[in-house]
Amino acid sequence: MRARHKIFEALKNTPEGLRFCRTWDKRAKYPENQYQNPFTLEEVLEMEGNGVGVLLGRHSTTTINGKKYGLGAIDFDGTDSDLTFEHHVGFDPAALTKTVTVTSGKKDRKQMFYWIPEEYLDVLKKGEYKHEGWANFELRIGDHYSM
């Protein structure tokens, strides 16, 4: 893996239950099915690639106070995506609980990660919500990876 040590330093304190896929230029372009055989951080860093993605839903789990959770993400993409979120969900995303957030550095783009209680993982559906063309947000849970 290119930049293996830099990636490890950035992710070494992530929860034990997170699972990863290898990527090339922000795409999972490899023959293995990362959803059937997800990798630990250590495993994925030994492979070819130039980045890693974290798998969502039941692929990346943790237990908090005896309760099991899977990882979910809300992806905000484009100017006014916060208004699109508010239109479809019913409240301003600024009211969301503070959480780990990542960005590519591009204006108005970010992903916010949340632990979803196990009983809701099958109830919540992946969805993409667009409003007036470009501004959208996406709820990512099941067979999906995030960069």
Role assignments for model-derived ranges:
Residues M1-M147:
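Conserved phosphate/metal-binding and DNA-contacting active-site motifs used
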